[in-house]
Amino acid sequence: MSSRQRAVCESVPTRSSAQLADQLRARISKGTLAGGSFLPSERELAREQKVSSKTARRALKLLESEALIVSESRRGYRVLSRANDPDRGCPIAMVIANPPESGDRSFYGSLLGALQDAAGRRGWSLLGVQREGRPIGEVVERLRAARACGAVVDSLDTELLEAVRRLGVPVVLADAWFADSPCDAVVQDGFAGGVLAAEWLAGRGHRRIAFLGPDPRGADMLVVERFSGAVGGLARSGLALDPGLTAVTRQGDPDAAARCARELLSRADRPTAVLALWQGFAREAARAARELGLAVGRDLDLVGWTTSPAPGAPEATGAAGPELSAEVVWSPADLAELCILRLMQRRADPRMPASLTRVPVRLEVRG
């Protein structure tokens, strides 16, 4: 064979695009090409692997069709976490970004337990990651090291969310949401709950109905939705929320909530019913009523908000025990199941549009 013939033979690609894709797929599966990292450009890959640019391009497109990588404008192909298989021990991560307030511990405990149950039914594991006191880079590195296959996050911190998404990890917001969010979210149906509670009180003949809760001004969307539901429920019943009977303060401040509740119920023209649609606020309203000698059900009606018990657990009595007329009830188990379902869908098709899913609520009358 002449030197010219030898050169021509050596320039012909010796591998197909499918073979190159197999090699890259194996490296992604083993984690040597980590989620969030970028592959070499088509030209660099062709040169490294001694294949034509066309072969490299076809291999990359094949991996993209399998949702193992995604093309990003002017940056190249980023590795996704789809190769981090939960059936092979890669965990789902629950990133708790906001430390639980004293009144919210039951929420976080219920949600973590529900996620563990939902993952366990599929034979999967759950990794809990606390954000408090840790830089974002440390949280992201923990997810990378564990090869998390998806992340359930409770935060509205856009910097944290973007850092996790850059790993190629599917992200679902759990009971957190903001307008134009690039992430899927699963939330309690606060609007429907507010409507149910307000309509129930109006149906019992109440006309002086108070609202006790977080200040909706500048609040997150879930606070605004619950407040708006209460206003809408009254409007459907031909009533309006009296500004003079609207007691709002900062969420997570039990002392401020206690002051608001006591001031509301100690006035000469006190309300005959109170919408306290957060556990902490319902607790303080019930305490204030008790200290003022008012009996719930006789002197006023009080509607709160609570979680339904896990299967096999004792029946829930809510934030204020039996001292409530009714409660809006939602299921952490349903929220957890929908979060995992959405992660599975996102893993299968990373290009789906972001969605907002609402967990149904119901009104339960006490006593």
In which residue ranges do the predicted regions lie?
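Amphipathic helical "hinge" segments at domain boundaries
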Residues: 18-22, 30, 42, 84-141, ...
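Periplasmic-binding protein-like
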Residues: 93-94, 147-155, 210-213, 268-281, ...
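Glycine-centered, phosphate/nucleic-acid-interacting loop/turn motifs that mediate DNA/RNA or nucleotide
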Residues: 31, 66-67
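Flexible loop/turn connectors
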Residues: 23, 258, 262-367
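Flexible loop/hinge segments that line or gate small-molecule binding clefts
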Residues: 155-196, 280, 306-325
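Extreme N-terminal segment that seeds HTH/winged-HTH DNA-binding domains in transcriptional regulators
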Residues: 1-54, 58-61, 84-85, 356
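Hinge/beta->alpha junction and helix N-cap segments in small-molecule ligand-binding domains
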Residues: 98-110, 128-136, 186-196, 212-262, ...
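N-terminal helix-turn-helix/winged-helix DNA-binding helices
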Residues: 9-13, 34-37, 70-102
